[in-house]
Amino acid sequence: MYQSLLKSLNRLNPRAWDFIQLTRMDKPIGIYLLLWPTLWALWIAGKGSPSLANIVIFVLGVVLTRAGGCVINDWADRKVDGHVKRTAQRPIAAGKISSKEALVFFALLMGVSFLLVLCTNAATIWLSLGGLALAFTYPFMKRYTYYPQVVLGAAFSWGMPMAFTAETGELPATAWLLWIANLLWTVGYDTYYAMTDRDDDLKIGVKSTAILFGDADRVIILTLQVLSLGCLVLAGSKFELGMWFHLGLLVAAGCYAWEFWYTRDRDRMRCFRAFLHNHWAGLAIFVGIVLDYALR
């Protein structure tokens, strides 16, 4: 139904589907993976009752910034995507959208996102500039370092300190524990994603943690996930979160264990499904946080 709704936009403009594919709006997994940790932070900062205005601002901000990140990523990879089977038909690589159109669209998405941030406060506005820098920098990292997933993790976690400053006007040191936890989690699940392209990336010289980790990939991913949970346990104790929060972490741990088992043969599609599966871990943690505050 969701896909049909998006495709119906072609009736308004025959090129609408090209821009939907460019922003990955037809593949909302990236929205979920960015949204859940942002909401973790927003709920904790608001002690279970964040302002409705901030909820709207951050949900819309997640959708827009993720879309913008996809656009700038495809623009940066426009000469590479055509050599990778999975990405060869992306709109810029396939010539459906020009480089100039992509840059203008990216600027438009970031401009609207910034207008949302202007509805918060000075501290959040300043922090948003760091998020913009990370979003623009990430796509180029895979050319120079084996750690582009770390930059992605920093970018995908940047909404968390922003949530604290928007909701409270302050940024407690403990909030950075949440940031670190999400960074570790992101590096883990994006390594699963990178494992699906590892063979192609080796041929064209693109770097990733999947290549760096080699045969130790799954063990390192699981280690990162366990460390992420450890950071969340520490943060939970500082923020006085209780049983429901820890039950959410337990469900997430179960998700990670299943992913480790499921990818035992490193089949491409299994690695991709493991990447997608991380959305449920993020949701479980969010539900745990919500229930922990709601049932006090």
From Swiss-Prot:
Cellular component (GO) terms are: plasma membrane
Could you say which EC number(s) this protein's record lists?
2.5.1.39
An example of a Pfam family matching this protein is UbiA
Q: Name one GO molecular function term.
A: 4-hydroxybenzoate polyprenyltransferase activity
Q: In which pathway does it act?
A: Cofactor biosynthesis; ubiquinone biosynthesis
Q: Which residues cross the membrane?
A: 28-48, 52-72, 102-122, 146-166, 169-189, 219-239, 241-261, 275-295
Keywords for this protein: Cell inner membrane, Cell membrane, Magnesium, Membrane, Transferase, Transmembrane, Transmembrane helix, Ubiquinone biosynthesis
State where the protein is found: Cell inner membrane
Q: Which Gene3D superfamilies match?
A: UbiA prenyltransferase (1.20.120.1780)
Q: Which GO terms describe its biological process?
A: ubiquinone biosynthetic process
Task: Tell me the protein family, please.
Answer: Belongs to the UbiA prenyltransferase family.
Q: What PANTHER family does this protein's entry cite?
A: 4-HYDROXYBENZOATE POLYPRENYLTRANSFERASE, MITOCHONDRIAL, PRENYLTRANSFERASES
Q: What does this protein do?
A: Catalyzes the prenylation of para-hydroxybenzoate (PHB) with an all-trans polyprenyl group. Mediates the second step in the final reaction sequence of ubiquinone-8 (UQ-8) biosynthesis, which is the condensation of the polyisoprenoid side chain with PHB, generating the first membrane-bound Q intermediate 3-octaprenyl-4-hydroxybenzoate.
Identification of the protein by name:
4-hydroxybenzoate octaprenyltransferase
